[in-house]
Amino acid sequence: MDKTRDKLLQPEHHDPYLKAWHQRSDTLCPRCGAAYQAGRWTWHGLVDASNAQEALCPACQRIAEDVPAGTISLRGAFVKAHTDELSGLIRNTEENEKGEHPLERLMAISDEPDGLRVTTTGLHLARRIGHALEAAYDGELNILYDGEAYYVDVHWLRD
């Protein structure tokens, strides 16, 4: 049997905040400066910004509406003892990801009674933060994708 036909096709779950952008022309986000051109959001600006539309990019829209695509929960005694260090790793991971992918951003890092809660505008950043925590500090990582919605819940525990 042909190997390319032997694969099961998985349904695609796309970010609902991106659906409206597939037919748009050149656009600049007035809040963050990201540019939409040729079907992609970038930090490189537009070739011809004179005819560009202005609209919030999907990341700025998620931030304004407080609708995260990812949540990371950090729990355990280690978290309370190393909050600044963990926050630094989270921010550095965001800077690296955001440099190439403008829609992957931190929304908030919040203190909670049993640890930290981090929200992101994209699935990939949440997953990448989880893997960075596990690689740097070991601990127990659990990543749960919502099968119906564009959302990921990441749990990291270290006592």
Task: Tell where the protein language model's regions lie, with residue ranges.
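N-terminal cysteine/histidine-rich coordination modules
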Residues: 1-65
